Curated annotation (Swiss-Prot):
Pathway(s) where this gene product acts: Metabolic intermediate metabolism; carbamoyl phosphate degradation; CO(2) and NH(3) from carbamoyl phosphate: step 1/1
PANTHER family on file: CARBAMATE KINASE, CARBAMATE KINASE-RELATED
Gene3D superfamilies recorded: Acetylglutamate kinase-like
Pfam families: AA_kinase
Keyword Oxidoreductase in annotation: no
UniProt name for this protein: Carbamate kinase 1
Keywords in alphabetical order: Arginine metabolism, ATP-binding, Cytoplasm, Kinase, Nucleotide-binding, Transferase
GN (gene name): arcC1
EC numbers: 2.7.2.2
Record NCBIfam families: arcC, PRK12352.1
Annotated localization: Cytoplasm
Length: 310
């Protein structure tokens, strides 16, 4: 039996609640399949599109005197509940359908960051909708947002993405796992908080990369494998070119060379690779699998996906 952290990509979860629910139902079958094979899993998820849409909608309401503006920490908490609810419900239904009595819990999770992290001066985490160049430039002029081109898919707003330091609810996660509970935690990389005097915490405007928090979670609970599910089947070098090549198996040293060659796009694949390296360096016996949500079953059979080891 292996202990596995499964990190679901926010972009792979669809663009609407309806699309997300449909995708999540299919994902639940694959995740429950891992459980029936005897594996112990913990689930995390991204929230880039979702938290951006929540923030955009609430800000629109505030600008039209229909409600207050909400900080990003609160928007992150909302996205954890929204995505976690759909995952939790789908997993509960799938477990019930096969006669398995197992509790599923979504844990609102805070993650400590450093308020002096240089990321706060260099926004890099894409969130929200995709825009063409003209739309992005217009919004940037009107609202002062920062936009970047995102892996050939269009332009997206970027926000600070500080490094995760510690998971505040870690002991609660461990307790739930020990009691045979299927845990959904660290959604969207966790709600970013900074430490104040007397060990208090306060939310801060940022979005933590979910793969980096998932790697931290995996190392903290000493899991055997980190599975990162995204929108593509493999990690590629020369991505989106005529000579792009999938990496089927690779290692930390090779990935570091590819990083030096700027093979991985900032804000999309690069954080996943950095998370994989971090996980393996903190857990040398572990491995990382990166593939698409749709190909999870095939990837678990070794037919597709990128496997990373030390």
């Amino acid at each position: 039996m292996a202990k596995i952290v499964v990190a679901l990509g926010g972009n792979a979860l669809g663009k609407s609640p309806q699309e997300q629910l449909k995708l999540v139902k299919n994902t639940a079958k694959s995740l429950v399949g891992l459980i029936t094979k005897g594996h112990e899993i913990v689930i995390s998820h991204g929230n880039g599109p979702q938290v951006g849409s929540i923030n955009l909608g609430l800000n629109y309401a505030a600008e039209h005197n229909q409600g207050p503006a909400f900080p990003f920490a609160e928007c992150g908490a909302m996205s954890q509940a929204y995505i976690g609810y759909q995952l939790q419900e789908s997993l509960q239904n799938e477990l019930h359908s096969i006669g398995m009595d197992k509790q599923v819990v979504t844990l609102v999770t805070q993650v400590e960051v450093d308020e002096n992290d240089p990321a706060f001066n260099n926004p890099s985490k894409p969130i929200g909708l995709f825009y063409n160049k003209e739309e992005a430039e217009q919004i940037q002029k009107e609202k002062g947002f920062t936009f970047v081109e995102d892996a050939g898919r269009g332009y997206r707003r970027v926000v600070p993405s500080p490094q995760p330091i510690s998971i505040i609810e870690l002991e609660s996660i461990k307790t739930l796992i020990k009691n045979d509970t299927l845990v959904i935690a660290a959604g969207g990389g966790g709600i970013p908080v900074i430490r104040e005097q007397h060990d208090g915490f306060k939310g801060i405007d940022a979005v933590i990369d979910k793969d980096k928090t998932s790697a931290l979670l995996g190392a903290n609970i000493q899991c055997d494998q980190l599975i990162i599910l995204t929108a593509i089947d493999y990690v590629y070098i020369n991505f989106n070119t005529e000579n792009q090549q999938p990496l089927k198996t690779t290692n930390v040293d090779e990935l570091k060379r590819y990083i030096d060659e700027n093979q991985f796009a900032k804000g999309s694949m690069l954080p996943k690779i950095e998370a994989a390296i971090s996980f393996i360096e903190n857990n040398p016996k572990g491995s990382v699998l990166i593939t698409s949500l749709n190909e999870l079953d095939a990837a678990l059979e070794g037919k597709v996906g990128t496997v990373i080891k030390k």
